[in-house]
Amino acid sequence: MSTILTTENLSLFYGKKEALKGINIDFDDKGITALIGPSGCGKSTFLRCLNRMNDLIPNVTITGEVNFNGHNIYAPTTDTVQLRKEIGMVFQQPNPFPFSIYENVIYGLRLAGVHDKERLDAAVEKSLKQAAIWDEVKDRLHANALSLSGGQQQRVCIARVLAVEPDIILLDEATSALDPISSRMIEETLLNLRQDYTIITVTHNMQQASRISDRTAFFLNGELIEVNDTKQIFMNPVKQETNDYISGRFG
């Protein structure tokens, strides 16, 4: 399988504090990778490095490279708006904009200068179907997205990312604020998307990681301890630290 994203000796500092320590990892083109580890281990910080969301935080220094389709995204010539279209992100708390479901989904397309109504209509239907929420909202596309339940809002946020046709979808604990039924629906959505997208998800939920991911990476104290096929990580990890975390000895 080909590689779509690679980090090389990636480190991040908040002031003088080193939060990520020389991370080297490859991500396959298509499929789901789960990033696991205890709170404060660096997994969410790492995730935000992958589409330069940490640029928005003051006093952050990043060294090393993140290569996306062979291009270092930290090169001065990188268009970060285009980058975040190609590598989209879904956050922990559902964050629909305070306007209609329809306008939420096409927000990125409008920013990109798309105004053709047929194209926008088609993108809305396709994206909402991919996010497994079309049947629930197709008759009220012009209702305010904030009127939806938390789980529905999160699927609209996924549809908003999908509408601009990204290559990679990043999810930062995208189900942790949801009830179990809504979480399961998001999981099923991700499983349906894994054939067409590279999905990288941060999760504290060990069962979720084992259910949905193809590969799992374990972070601890800013270091990547181990990355492997998910079955291997959960059934026969190589590193003692991984085994201790998986078996609940800390975290």
Swiss-Prot record:
What are its E.C. numbers? 7.3.2.1
Q: Name one GO cellular component term.
A: plasma membrane
Subcellular location(s) per record:
Cell membrane
Q: Which residues cross the membrane?
A: none
Entry's Gene Ontology BP terms:
phosphate ion transmembrane transport
> Which GO molecular function annotation, any one, does this entry have?
ATP binding
Q: Which enzyme class?
A: translocase
Principal localization reads: membrane
Keywords tagged on the record: ATP-binding, Cell membrane, Membrane, Nucleotide-binding, Phosphate transport, Translocase, Transport
User: Entry's Pfam families?
Assistant: ABC_tran
Q: How the protein sits in the membrane?
A: Peripheral membrane protein
Q: Where is the ABC transporter domain?
A: 5-246
User: Where does the chain bind ATP?
Assistant: 37-44
Q: Which reaction does it catalyse?
A: phosphate(out) + ATP + H2O = ADP + 2 phosphate(in) + H(+)
Family per similarity comment: Belongs to the ABC transporter superfamily. Phosphate importer (TC 3.A.1.7) family.
* Physiological role: Part of the ABC transporter complex PstSACB involved in phosphate import. Responsible for energy coupling to the transport system.
Quaternary structure? The complex is composed of two ATP-binding proteins (PstB), two transmembrane proteins (PstC and PstA) and a solute-binding protein (PstS).
Instruction: Please state what the protein is called.
Output: Phosphate import ATP-binding protein PstB 2
Gene behind this protein = pstB2
